[in-house]
Amino acid sequence: MVVIGAGQAGLSAAYYLRKFGIEPESGFVVLDHASGPGGAWQFRWPSLTLSTVNGVHDLPGMSFAETTGTDAEQVPASVAVPHYFELYEKQFELPVHRPVHTRVVCPREERLRIETDQGVFAARGLINATGTWERPFIPHYRGAESFRGRQLHTKDYRTAAEFEGKHVVVVGGGISAVQLLDEISRVTTTTWVTRREPEFRDEPFTPDIGRDAVAMVEDRVRRGLPPGSVVSVTGLPVTPAIRAARERGVMNRLPMFSEILPNGVKWADGTVDADVILWCTGFRSSLDHLAPLHLRGPGGGIPMTGRLATQVEADPRVHLVGYGPSSSTIGANRAGQAAARELTAYLGIGE
């Protein structure tokens, strides 16, 4: 078997494969495109610290808190989480082949042919945990190519200081958009633009809210629809930082502009000059390498089945963890366990 991806979902799946009696290297291999441990966390912007991150859940069998120390709140997540993942790989003897770029996965009778830049693997089963970081999404708007300023995606963001003295248009209604809007607005002027009116959640996040959100996303993927985001169901939490930003007048949202001009953006009733457009418009699942398997259904998504909707309906040898309802870190752990259990049972191997 092959596990592609060594982020939260991939490491969880590898842990449970080993727990179910499958030995690494002889029974399964883990391939990861990054040069070091940490999944997408290693690429996050430095100001995203453990005090501002939306939550890092424990991998099975090892506490994250035990690896961070007592004064970890201001440690960048891009440092703390990769350190945790590195210790985890060593603790549970989960060798990860890296960097390995998976080019394509093709059906070959009873096996899957997995072609990479480091060679070819033949696998009876596949757990795909490639996440979304490699597929940033930027919607197309008329005039985008004429803009004389800078356009960048959340993935490219490093620090607010580089925008000092420039007017920044922040596009997007998710958690990252709100966090970066707040951060940038402390050093320069901003305009916030979203496609829909953001929904804020004043009440505390409860397990029931989380379960309801996951259930709605799970229903979509079981019906073969594109997953949608969990935050679109849960709403945005009103943190002290957001309250302070409201008081500073930063959270006054405008609807989406209709056109991008060389020096700004345009609505039907006016324009705003801009030096920078920051697209906090999310990511799409990194699944292009699976295209030869023809997994997508007529609904535009991949119809999923299994206990936690990790098994691909069109090919039970393939599980997607970190897709749809398992895209959160806590969901990824449960999905990794379910995928490992169901795949080994389907193949008739392991304990």
Where are the regions that the model predicts?
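Redox-cofactor-proximal catalytic regions of oxidoreductases
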Residues: 36-64
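Flavin (primarily FAD) cofactor-binding/catalytic cores of flavoenzymes
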Residues: 1-35, 39-42, 47, 73-351
